[in-house]
Amino acid sequence: MSNTTFRPFTGSSRTVVEGEQAGAQDDMSLLQSLFSDKSREEFAKECKLGMYTNLSSNNRLNYIDLVPKNTGSRALNLFKSEYEKGHIPSSGVLSIPRVLVFLVRTTTVTESGSVTIRLVDLISASSVEILEPVDGTQEATIPISSLPAIVCFSPSYDCPMQMIGNRHRCFGLVTQLDGVISSGSTVVMSHAYWSANFRSKPNNYKQYAPMYKYVEPFDRLKRLSRKQLKNYVRGITNQSVNHGYLLGKPLLKTDEQDPEMIVLEEESLTPTDSNGVGKDKIAVTAKSVAGLPTASLSINRR
């Protein structure tokens, strides 16, 4: 074979067919679900791309493969055939340089508990009956209240393409919730990104502990410009709704003024004159003010 490196995909989170996940309450139940006849049929289908993993207290542990099983099977058969012919030096390895996991909180900031992410090698399940982190270090635990965050993993070796029981050996991601109060509902959503290569020559790499960064939540009130505020007011102001027949009021004529009209003074966003009065004013109905960020606005009656 002239080219002994294959790039079958560069992807993002893959879950089992129809967006399902392998979930369980403890390690033994998780392993049984992974290696059962049912899971063998489900994991035989290509995993979907771009799927978020929902984490809830119902399924405290979740697992996803980093390679769709059909893709891994085809690569294994191809490399094995070429190896037996003497065209390549090995039966192939899976190389994943790094895995980037984005975690988002989907519950109140007062939620207790934490989320743990582990990069695992399925070989650990056959030897110690538990999915241990790769290198004993590729694991990170983050309080749910501190999310959003990004975690990066990097294994120090390439994974041989071989069979472990009735499954292909593969790198995978385990997510685990601990100390969560909410019952049944999704409290965290995770999304992973990585690239995977199949190679004929294995290698070792410098070992790193997982790196993670907390992401500053977007401040959707503070970062509104004056133009955005005006557009927001125009977008929520609908005369046919505020004054329409559904509310028992006729539509206003163009030369009439509604007695309920108020003025919004953009104090922090608009230059003021010597008397401290805002130069730019936006007239909207009292009913359409709901939802506006009031921290930088004052409301005065005419």
UniProtKB/Swiss-Prot annotation:
Protein name, entry field: Movement protein
One Pfam short name: 3A
Q: Which InterPro entries match?
A: MPV (IPR000603)
Record's keyword terms, sorted:
Host cell junction, Transport, Viral movement protein
Q: What organism is listed for this UniProt entry?
A: Cowpea chlorotic mottle virus (CCMV)
Any single GO CC term annotated in Swiss-Prot or TrEMBL for this entry: host cell plasmodesma
GO BP, sorted A to Z: transport of virus in host, cell to cell
**Similarity-based family:** Belongs to the bromovirus movement protein family.
Secreted among the record's keywords? no
Where does it localize?
Host cell junction, Host plasmodesma
Function as written in the Swiss-Prot or TrEMBL entry: Transports viral genome to neighboring plant cells directly through plasmosdesmata, without any budding. The movement protein allows efficient cell to cell propagation, by bypassing the host cell wall barrier. Acts by forming a tubular structure at the host plasmodesmata, enlarging it enough to allow free passage of virion capsids.
Keyword set includes Repeat: no
